[in-house]
Amino acid sequence: MKLNSIEANAHYDMAHGMPAVLERDNDGSHLYRFNIEVEMGIPDGQEKEVQIGWKCCEIRTFNKPTKANLKKAIIRSVLDETAEFDLVNSYNKHVLGVAVDENAVAAYKEYLQFTEDLDVLLVNTLSN
């Protein structure tokens, strides 16, 4: 589970321009965008690849867009509570010797690194 491997779910054309990281929508929700990247493509009738817009991961929340609320929303977009508890429980079983499983340790470490990367991303993007 890598933060930069979350697939883009939003695309913006050149007319719209680069999307804002945080935006309040008309319905009272907030959109938080991350992994914003240039999107390249070959427009109809052309042969050369050019920038056709932007792509990013977009999360909508009706809660106040705090670091904690956005972190929860992003985690839930890739991992539901049951799967998260399973990671923790499998790791604890291994540590306590109930069910030895080295894969549980690796999976939990990967999850912890994901949450750490997410913390860094949120601090960097929300402080600007």
Model feature map: region roles:
Residues 1-128:
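A preference for well-ordered globular domain cores
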